[in-house]
Amino acid sequence: MGRGPDERRGMSRVILLDNEAVQALADPAHPKHLRAVSHAQVAVTRKARALPVSIAVPAAVRVEAGRDRTSSSWAFINRLRIADIPLDPGHANAAAGVRNRTRVSVADAHLGAAIGAAYQVTVLTSDPLDMSVVAEGKHIEVVAL
């Protein structure tokens, strides 16, 4: 009865991107571009092998990074099928709570809300300390760019 630990193994893993990860993916001249692309390729490879993994970016992070999906300068990153996590009422309330408790930026607070809503989380970030703060004790995998 109920869910045992083995039943959760099939649940989806999400890779969340922070502002610099989004910018690094988009700009081949960015010093962290190759590292960011290599992590994105791992996710694409896992999808191809039918392993449940997705890459996502909270809307507030996308805005902070200046990512306009309609701009041709973002064509490469658009091909990676990175999902947007909307700042809907539920996420907005959760993000406001994270921001009030931790005093981080709005974008980092939205990342914290996304972390709280997901089961297995990897965060690709330039600031591992901030991600540990916004995770508020939840176990996450942090990959530093």
Placement of each model-derived feature along the sequence:
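Short, well-structured N-terminal submotif of metal-dependent ribonuclease cores
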Residues: 1-55, 66-79
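Short beta-strand scaffold positions
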Residues: 57, 86, 106, 125-126
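Short, flexible loop segments at the rims of nucleotide/cofactor-binding pockets, characterized by
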Residues: 24-29, 62-63, 99-103
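Acidic, PIN/NYN-like endoribonuclease modules and their adjacent C-terminal/linker elements
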Residues: 1-12, 117-145
